[in-house]
Amino acid sequence: MNLAKRILQGEQLTKETVLKIYEDTNIDTLDLLNEAYILRKHYFGKKVKLNMILNAKSGICPENCGYCGQSRDIKQKQRYALIPEEQIIDGAKVAHDNHIGTYCIVMSGRGPSDKEVDHISNTVRTIKSQHPQLKICACLGLTNDEQAKKLKSAGVDRYNHNINTSENYHDNVVTTHSYKDRTDTIELMKANNISPCSGVICGMGESNQDIVDMAFALKEMDADSIPINFLHPIKGTKFGSMDDLTPMKCLRIVALFRLINPTKEIRIAGGREVNLRSLQPLALKAANSIFVGDYLITGGQPNQLDYDMINDLGFEIDYDTCENKENKNEVSRAN
């Protein structure tokens, strides 16, 4: 194949070429993953970036996203308003103590009120005064220009707003907002010099063409960070009984995203534990970033298992991206 070599020499793969490769059953997934690893190693070495999520506001949402346990259609769910500043600040200390590079503050809902943006902004200022090198990612929904400027001024480094799926498949996933609403939000953040983070959820019934289209859309968007989520079906949601993924399919998807976005941070995110299962470590041959700890309303695995996974691969935590560089040997024993 020599895909990695061709890409490093400047070749731009087309959608048609990538789809053909992705669907070719004669191309072994592990061979494809090895091509992705050549690119991952070239641009990121063996380092793994760590991220942590805080669910700062839960279950209060008017949207009908078919994958989400916080959507308006779910009656039994965890509901609480935006938590106090002190709790968010405490979460930042946990992130610092666990060698996390990026701390992600997430809110449910269509978008934040001005009061909520002020609350988050004040909190971020305090966090930055205590942990100046800890990167802050906000995920608050649809925002306006004034709100984006406030977040930037407060010290927010990155803003996450996932496209989730392809433009073609979008209305099968949610109808209360448009695909353009999502892409416009990312463009707004870029206009305000906030690093754009946008990713996908795979396993919602999308086609192979949709998967390829998602990866190219994020390339065209120039997202700095790309989280790849794998559907963790939640009872009562539209996709609650969906079972469309295997560990090998997940690996093939991650490899494809690396081939199309060779220089970007690619993160294996929600659903990795239940979908990749014993093959989680192999995903880091293509991805260079993970979430540590729990997700929004589903649990992750114990932190130490993630540290061990990184060590066992011969990889290492990317200490260049985290503030806490002390006691490295407690979490990283790689040579």
Curated annotation (Swiss-Prot):
UniProt cofactor note: Binds 1 [4Fe-4S] cluster. The cluster is coordinated with 3 cysteines and an exchangeable S-adenosyl-L-methionine. Binds 1 [2Fe-2S] cluster. The cluster is coordinated with 3 cysteines and 1 arginine.
Lineage top rank: taxon: Bacteria
Record key words, sorted: 2Fe-2S, 4Fe-4S, Biotin biosynthesis, Iron, Iron-sulfur, Metal-binding, S-adenosyl-L-methionine, Transferase
Binding-site residues for [2Fe-2S] cluster, renumbered to this chain: C104, C137, C197, R267
Binding site for [4Fe-4S] cluster: C61, C65, C68
Pathway: Cofactor biosynthesis; biotin biosynthesis; biotin from 7,8-diaminononanoate: step 2/2
Essential cofactor(s): [4Fe-4S] cluster; [2Fe-2S] cluster
Pfam families (alphabetical): BATS, Radical_SAM
Reaction(s) catalysed (UniProt annotation): (4R,5S)-dethiobiotin + (sulfur carrier)-SH + 2 reduced [2Fe-2S]-[ferredoxin] + 2 S-adenosyl-L-methionine = (sulfur carrier)-H + biotin + 2 5'-deoxyadenosine + 2 L-methionine + 2 oxidized [2Fe-2S]-[ferredoxin]
GO molecular function, one term: 4 iron, 4 sulfur cluster binding
GO biological process, one term: biotin biosynthetic process
SMART domains per record: BATS, Elp3
Record SUPFAM superfamilies: Radical SAM enzymes
Residue ranges of every copy of the Radical SAM core domain listed in the record: 43-269
Gene3D superfamilies with a match to the protein in the record: Aldolase class I
EC number(s) given by UniProt: 2.8.1.6
Assembly description: Homodimer.
NCBIfam families: bioB (TIGR00433)
Function: Catalyzes the conversion of dethiobiotin (DTB) to biotin by the insertion of a sulfur atom into dethiobiotin via a radical-based mechanism.
Family the entry assigns: Belongs to the radical SAM superfamily. Biotin synthase family.
Name used for this protein in its record: Biotin synthase
Organism: Staphylococcus aureus (strain NCTC 8325 / PS 47)
Gene: bioB
